[in-house]
């Protein structure tokens, strides 16, 4: 989904410029991993979450990515957590060569379908907003869904990370 969101953003940007008669312009897309996706009960699982998020954002066309340290939900991350956050990007960049392909997901049926569906839904929301009917967020959508490391598949023993200050 992350990958399709970023692809959709670029398509929507181009459409918005076209509809408004503006000249085509590049979209500079800077993203950051989400604090909300960080589990506080099993912080080490956040390393995997960050890796998946960076991978999706990179394949989706993000220009720059900031990775929050895995222990951010507990407090001020220590040097190790900050180092891991930097290394997530460095490893994906240097070892997977994500940067070598402009749109690696192009032609993948499911990704193309998901990107198109996101574009259509976002454009409808945008049109409604422009007509003064601002869409309201649906906070009930994710209620009850399990979160790995928080409400499902908890580690048998907690291994708290080192932090420099409490949150």
Where on the chain are the PLM-derived regions?
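Short, glycine-/Ser/Thr-/acidic-enriched flexible segments
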Residues: 34-37, 62, 70-72, 153-159, ...
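Helix-rich catalytic cores of soluble enzyme domains
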Residues: 1-57, 68-89
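Catalytic-core signal marking the mid-to-C-terminal active-site face
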Residues: 83-167
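Short acidic/histidine-rich active-site segments
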Residues: 61-72, 98-105
């Amino acid at each position: 989904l992350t990958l399709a969101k970023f692809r959709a953003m670029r398509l929507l940007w181009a459409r918005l410029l076209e509809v408004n008669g503006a000249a085509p312009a590049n979209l500079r897309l800077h993203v950051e991993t989400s604090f909300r996706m960080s589990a506080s009960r099993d912080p080490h699982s956040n390393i995997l979450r960050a890796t998946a998020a960076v991978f999706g954002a990179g394949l989706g066309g993000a220009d720059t990515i900031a990775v929050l340290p895995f222990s951010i939900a507990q407090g001020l991350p220590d040097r190790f957590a900050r180092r891991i956050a930097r290394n997530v990007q460095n490893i994906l960049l240097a070892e997977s060569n994500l940067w070598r392909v402009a749109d690696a997901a192009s032609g993948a049926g499911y990704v193309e379908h998901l990107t198109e569906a996101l574009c259509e839904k976002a454009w409808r929301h945008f049109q409604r907003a422009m007509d003064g009917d601002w869409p309201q967020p649906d906070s009930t959508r994710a209620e009850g869904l399990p979160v790995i490391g928080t409400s499902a598949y908890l580690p048998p023993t907690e291994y708290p990370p080192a932090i420099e200050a409490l949150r």
